[in-house]
Design a protein with these regions (language model features):
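Right-handed parallel beta-helix/beta-spiral solenoid domain characteristic of secreted/periplasmic
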Residues: 1, 332-335, 370-423, 477
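Extracellular beta-strand/beta-solenoid scaffold signature
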Residues: 1-3, 23-36, 51-63, 78-82, ...
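Feature marks extracellular polysaccharide-active and adherence modules
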Residues: 3, 12, 17, 37, ...
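Parallel beta-helix/beta-solenoid
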Residues: 3-6, 11, 29, 38-39, ...
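Long, contiguous C-terminal flanking segments immediately downstream of a protein's structured core
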Residues: 121-282
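Extracellular mucin-like PTS domains
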Residues: 281-309
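Acidic Gly/Asp/Thr-rich repetitive segments characteristic of extracellular carbohydrate-active
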Residues: 316-365
C-alpha cells in the first residue's frame, strides 16, 4: 500500500491475490490489498483483484485534508469489500467492474465525498454504502460506527444488488445522491445522517481533470480485456458465479493454485537473474558463426550435446580486459578499453572480457567518434562475462561522470556502470542504443539524457533518437543531500525521439 505522504502516483495493471492471514476473523484472505493513506493525486487503474477480502482502504482517521484519488477500470473479481472504503478523501470512482461482490462496493465515512460514475455492478450485494444510514443500517453497520459522508452517483449499471436507495427515494436513509448529468452539483441541503457533512462537489470544481467516461457496458468489456497483467497474466482461473458471488470464504482451490504457482520470468530489464548477472545474448557482428557444436553418442545412452564458444576474430573485433596491454586481436592478447574505444571502426565490436574495470576519470566518447546508420560501434560484455566499470576512484563532483557518450550510433550492451562521482552515464549523442545495462550506486542519476557541449543552444543540437532498452538503474544516491539522484533522467536539454523501453528504476534517492 501507499502508506504516508505520497503524491502523484499511478498504480496500474497489477494482479492482487490473497495475502497472509491476519489475526482477525475478517483477515483470513489477508488485509488491505492496495491501501492508500495520507496521499494525494493518486490513480489506481486497470488492476485485477482476485477474491480479495479487503481491496482498497482509502484514508486514515487522522487525515484532515481533501486528498484527491481516482479509481478507474479496475476489476473487482469476486472480492468482498472496500472497493474502496473511504475516510475524509475526495474520490472519483468510474468505469470499474464489480463482479460478484459478497459484501459491498463503495463505502464512505468521516465526511468523505465520492463520485461514483458509470460503473458496472453485477451481483454486488450493496453497491454503495454511507456509514450509519440507508443500506448500512439494514446490514447492521459496516464501518465501526464512524460518521458518514456523501456519495454522488451517475450512470451506473446495477443488477443483482440486495439493496440500493437513492436520495430521491429516501432523503434521510439514502445510499447515494443520484444525478442524471455528471456536471450536476449536489446541493448543500444533502447531508450525511450521522455527522451532518455535505458533498464538496470536487468533481465540478477547478481541481477536476479532463476525462471521458465509457458507458458501463464498454467499461466492463475493457476491464475484462485489459485489467491486470498482459493477457491476463500466466495464472488462469474461472470463478463459479453460482457459488463465489455470495461467498466471502477463502476459495481453497484458488488458494492452492496461488500457493503452487511458479513464475516463468527469466529477467526483468537487466540485473534480475538468479545470480544477478546481466542477461546476455550474442551481439551480431559481420563475423561469421562464433560457435561449434560437438555431438557424442554412446550405445544405449542418451545423446549428449555440448556447445563451446569459439573466440571471434577479425579486423572489426577488439578484445579488452581490465589490465589489457596486447593488440586486442584475440582473447589471449586483449588491449585496454580506452585504446579500443579510439580505434574501433564503424560496424566493429569491442568485447569486454570478464572482470572489474577501475577508473578514476571519465571515459569520454567524443562527438566525432561515431558509427553510421548501418554500422554501429558496439561495446559489449563478452557472452557470459560479468563486467563492471567501477568509478569509485572519482571524487564526488558534477563533472565526474562515468561514461560520457557524445558520439552517435554506438551500442552499449550488457554490463554495469557503478560508483561514479556524478552520473553513471551522460548520454548526449544521437541515435545510440543503450541495452541491458545496469547503473548502480552512482552519486547522481544513473543515466542522464542531456547535452554535453554547453554551447549547444537549440533542440536540434541536443541528444535525439536514442533508445534506452531493458536497462536497470538502482541505488543511485548523492550522499550530501540524499535527494538529487534519479534512476533515469531526460533533462531540459534533451532533444526529440528518445525512447525508454522496458527499463526498471528502484531505490534511488
Amino acid at each position: 500500500g501507499l502508506q504516508q505522504k505520497n503524491d502523484h502516483i499511478w498504480v496500474h495493471n497489477c494482479d492482487f491475490f490473497y495475502g497472509d492471514a491476519g489475526s482477525d476473523a475478517d483477515q483470513v484472505k489477508g488485509d488491505g490489498a492496495l491501501d492508500t493513506k495520507t496521499s494525494t493525486y493518486v490513480t489506481h487503474s486497470y488492476n485485477h483483484f482476485w477474491d480479495n477480502g479487503k481491496c482498497n482502504l482509502q484514508g486514515m482517521k487522522s487525515e484532515s485534508t481533501e486528498n484527491y484519488i481516482t479509481y478507474h477500470h479496475n476489476w473487482y473479481d469476486h472480492s468482498d469489500s472496500r472497493h474502496p472504503r473511504i475516510r475524509t478523501c475526495s474520490v472519483h470512482i468510474y468505469n470499474n467492474y464489480y463482479d460478484g461482490n459478497a459484501k459491498y462496493g463503495v463505502g464512505v465515512t468521516m465526511g468523505a465525498s465520492a463520485f461514483v460514475e458509470n460503473n458496472y455492478f453485477r451481483n454486488c450485494n450493496y453497491p454503495m454504502l454511507i456509514s450509519k444510514q440507508g443500506s448500512d443500517d439494514l446490514s447492521g453497520g459496516t464501518f465501526s460506527g464512524e460518521n458518514g459522508g456523501v456519495i454522488k452517483a451517475c450512470g451506473n449499471y446495477i443488477t443483482g444488488a440486495k439493496a440500493y436507495t437513492t436520495y430521491q427515494q429516501d432523503p434521510t436513509g439514502f445510499d447515494a445522491y443520484e444525478v442524471s448529468n455528471a456536471k450536476e452539483t449536489v446541493p448543500s441541503s444533502v447531508k450525511a445522517k450521522q455527522g451532518g457533512t455535505t458533498y464538496n462537489n470536487f468533481d465540478t470544481s477547478s481541481v477536476m481533470y479532463s476525462y471521458t467516461a465509457d458507458s458501463p457496458e464498454e467499461a466492463k468489456e475493457k476491464v475484462m480485456a485489459r485489467a491486470g497483467r498482459v493477457d491476463g497474466g500466466d495464472l488462469k482461473w474461472t470463478f463459479d458465479n453460482s457459488v463465489d458471488d455470495a461467498s466471502y470464504a477463502v476459495n481453497e482451490a484458488l488458494k492452492a493454485a496461488i500457493v503452487a504457482y511458479k513464475d516463468s520470468i527469466v529477467a526483468i530489464g537487466s540485473g534480475f537473474t538468479d545470480n544477478n548477472d546481466p542477461v546476455v545474448t550474442t551481439v551480431t557482428t559481420s563475423v561469421k558463426s562464433t560457435t561449434t557444436t560437438v555431438t557424442t553418442t554412446q550405445p544405449q545412452q542418451t545423446t549428449t550435446t555440448t556447445t563451446s564458444t569459439v573466440p571471434v576474430v577479425g579486423s572489426d573485433v577488439i578484445y579488452v580486459s581490465p589490465n589489457g596491454g596486447g593488440d586486442g586481436k584475440s582473447m589471449n592478447s586483449p588491449t585496454d578499453v580506452l585504446t579500443a574505444i579510439k580505434s574501433v571502426p564503424a560496424g566493429g565490436t569491442i568485447y569486454l572480457l570478464d572482470g572489474t574495470y577501475k577508473f578514476s576519470e571519465t571515459i569520454l566518447i567524443k562527438e566525432n567518434n561515431s558509427g553510421t546508420a548501418g554500422k554501429y560501434k558496439t561495446i559489449s560484455a563478452y557472452p557470459g562475462a560479468k563486467v563492471k566499470f567501477d568509478f569509485s576512484g572519482q571524487a564526488v563532483a558534477g563533472a565526474n561522470r562515468g561514461f560520457v557518450l557524445d558520439g552517435a550510433y554506438w551500442h552499449f550492451y550488457g554490463f554495469e556502470i557503478a560508483n561514479a562521482g556524478d552520473n553513471g552515464m551522460l548520454l548526449s549523442g544521437d541515435n545510440n542504443i543503450i541495452e541491458m545495462m545496469i547503473f548502480n550506486g552512482n552519486q547522481d542519476t544513473g543515466l542522464q539524457l542531456s547535452r554535453y557541449n554547453t554551447s549547444y543552444a537549440s533542440v536540434a543540437e541536443w541528444p535525439t533518437n536514442n533508445l534506452i532498452k531493458n536497462c536497470t538503474s538502482k541505488n543511485n544516491c548523492d550522499d550530501a543531500t540524499m535527494e538529487n539522484a534519479d534512476g533515469f533522467a531526460a533533462k531540459l536539454t534533451c532533444g526529440e525521439g528518445n525512447v525508454f523501453d522496458g527499463c526498471m528504476s528502484y531505490n534511488n534517492s
